[in-house]
């Protein structure tokens, strides 16, 4: 009766065995360095304000409550982990499932495994070095090359991303077939050109860390004290994949509140629903999250490189198509 059902795993048993071995090796990497492994909730009262993230939500119906409660599936354990940092956890890491209500395909699955860790008293460069250590251990690859966002953008796009006029960015985006480019804001143009022109050209032979993204793309990173045009944010690229996104973390509660509010302003302009601001994170920041750097790394993409897989479902027991 059920012979035609697609019941078999997405990944081969061989790949699942290799996956388990690599995840165990990742855990050893961090425990050997004295980091505490933590677990935080998958469900939360608060979603995220970031306009670039689409979230899943559900409803908690309690027989003892007067009304149901909306809950959000985690897109990242970041906010909860920062609350632990404020409580005095020290350096921490986590391997967990996260959820993003976005595309599914060769490089994306709505549910995937995230490795996230935080290092009190590390600056951005020291954390880049630790990511490099991890990649060399897991992938046996060449050392990471660190390049500034400004440098790689000028190298491949031919414009200075920090000073180019919007008209120049529009003209360049049109060369790469962005429809109605003149209607997009400056950051959207930068992001389009970076993903379309820069990303395919970096990280082919060795991992590349791109640092000092424009301040307008700071997300939850600090603005550089040496150059206010850039943020202390970095990303890792290797073998055609964006692997990780890291920050010298923003710890100023007032600035964080302002950024959340600006996210909701942008959401309104884009016709997106506004999101409730996570007051518990703000409470932790006010209490004192230590100066730290943190990073989120896509484990499934790391496994794709390690195992030579062409699609993300080849390293997952079950991808979204047969979950």
Curated annotation (Swiss-Prot):
Organism the protein comes from: Pasteurella multocida (strain Pm70)
Gene name of the record: epmA
Enzyme class at the top of the EC tree: ligase
Similarity field: Belongs to the class-II aminoacyl-tRNA synthetase family. EpmA subfamily.
Complexes and interactors: Homodimer.
Residues the record lists as binding ATP: 100-102, 109, 242-243, 298
Record keywords, A-Z: ATP-binding, Ligase, Nucleotide-binding
UniProt GO molecular function: acid-ammonia (or amide) ligase activity; ATP binding; lysine-tRNA ligase activity; tRNA binding
Residues that hold substrate according to the record: 76-78, 118, 249
UniProt keyword Magnesium, yes or no: no
Cellular-component GO terms for this entry: cytosol
Catalytic activity reported: D-beta-lysine + L-lysyl-[protein] + ATP = N(6)-((3R)-3,6-diaminohexanoyl)-L-lysyl-[protein] + AMP + diphosphate + H(+)
Protein's name in the database: Elongation factor P--(R)-beta-lysine ligase
């Amino acid at each position: 009766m059920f012979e035609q059902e697609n019941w078999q795993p997405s990944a081969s048993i061989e790949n699942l065995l290799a996956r388990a071995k690599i995840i165990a090796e990742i855990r050893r990497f961090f425990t050997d360095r004295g980091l505490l492994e933590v677990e935080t909730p998958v469900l939360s009262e608060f979603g995220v304000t970031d306009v670039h993230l689409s979230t899943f939500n559900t409803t908690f119906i309690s027989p003892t409550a007067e009304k149901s409660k909306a809950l959000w599936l985690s897109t990242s354990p970041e906010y909860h982990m920062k609350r632990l940092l404020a409580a005095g956890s020290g350096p921490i890491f986590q391997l967990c499932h996260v959820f993003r209500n976005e595309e599914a395909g060769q490089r994306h699955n709505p549910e995937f495994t995230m490795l996230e860790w935080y290092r009190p008293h590390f600056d951005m460069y020291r954390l880049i070095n630790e990511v490099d250590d991890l990649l060399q251990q897991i992938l046996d690859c060449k050392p990471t090359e660190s390049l500034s966002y400004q440098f790689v953008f000028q190298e491949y796009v031919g414009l200075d991303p920090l000073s180019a006029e919007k008209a120049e960015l529009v003209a360049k985006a049109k060369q790469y077939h962005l429809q109605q480019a003149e209607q997009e804001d400056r950051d959207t143009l930068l992001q389009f050109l970076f993903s379309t022109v820069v990303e395919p050209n970096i990280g082919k032979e060795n991992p590349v860390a791109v640092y000092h993204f424009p301040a307008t793309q700071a997300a939850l990173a600090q603005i550089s004290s040496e150059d206010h045009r850039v943020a202390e944010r970095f990303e890792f690229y290797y073998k055609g994949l964006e692997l990780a996104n890291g920050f010298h973390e923003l710890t100023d509660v007032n600035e964080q509140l302002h950024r959340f509010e600006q996210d909701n302003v942008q959401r309104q302009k884009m016709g997106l629903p506004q999101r409730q601001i996570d007051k518990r994170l703000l409470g932790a920041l006010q209490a004192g999250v230590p100066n730290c750097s943190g990073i989120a790394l896509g484990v499934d993409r790391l496994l794709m490189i390690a195992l030579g897989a062409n699609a993300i479902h080849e390293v997952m027991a079950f991808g979204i198509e047969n979950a």
